[in-house]
Amino acid sequence: MPPHFLSADSTGQPHRHADRPKRVRTPGEPLRIGVGGPVGSGKTALVAALCRQLRDELSLAVLTNDIYTTEDADFLRRHAVLPDDRIAAVQTGGCPHTAIRDDITANLDAIDDLVAGHDHLDLILVESGGDNLTATFSSGLVDVQIFVVDVAGGDKVPRKGGPGVTFSDLLVINKTDLAPMVGADLDVMRRDSTKVRGERPFVLISLTADPTAGPVLDWVRAQLRVPVQG
């Protein structure tokens, strides 16, 4: 499937969809889960792990976002986590958050192509390009979102806050196996995550220790069980 590109209007400015209404999922539509977070936090590795665990029990597809390449989609194809036609890519050509929050047209077009190409999809994972702590998905694009940070950034990351850390439906603190090497205190990260997120869930994982991403997998399965209105 060829990559989709972020479009612009006649003035050369990106189309604006920041005010797009929240998506209302209807029966028969796939659940859309956004996976965002900084560069190198482990988003693609997490998506790959989820695909490996879920591909035999449901119908799923993946949509990746990169600025100038299709590197993340290519990685998933090389590792055969799904058939090639179930992996699509958007090339944003600019700040990654633009394509998942401000102008979601290219992502919506790619999702339409995935849905049209498969009789019934249960789940679409939408991975953002690597960005900073301010990146979030438009509620018109995804139903729920995961935000991934990693221990290598230091135990200060959760208390820095930001929309992704604070308001995502699930915060994933990845690469816990690196904590001793970088001097990060996991208890501090747990405390600060609880403080900034309140009752919103978070999990600490290491894909090295648990390649199945067990706690995230459990959360995704729980989202799939939520009744669809309609």
UniProtKB/Swiss-Prot annotation:
Its main location: cytoplasm. One of its GO terms (biological process) is urea catabolic process. It comes from the Bacteria. One of its GO terms (molecular function) is GTP binding. Residues 14-25 have a biased composition (Basic residues). Coiled coil: none annotated. One of its GO terms (cellular component) is cytoplasm. Keywords: Chaperone, Cytoplasm, GTP-binding, Nickel insertion, Nucleotide-binding. The keyword Chaperone applies. Residues 1-31 are annotated as: Disordered. It is found in: Cytoplasm. GTP binds at G37, P38, V39, G40, S41, G42, K43, T44. InterPro entries: CobW/HypB/UreG_nucleotide-bd, P-loop_NTPase, UreG. Pfam families: cobW. Facilitates the functional incorporation of the urease nickel metallocenter. This process requires GTP hydrolysis, probably effectuated by UreG. Homodimer. UreD, UreF and UreG form a complex that acts as a GTP-hydrolysis-dependent molecular chaperone, activating the urease apoprotein by helping to assemble the nickel containing metallocenter of UreC. The UreE protein probably delivers the nickel. HAMAP family: UreG. Belongs to the SIMIBI class G3E GTPase family. UreG subfamily. This is Urease accessory protein UreG. It comes from Mycobacterium sp. (strain KMS).
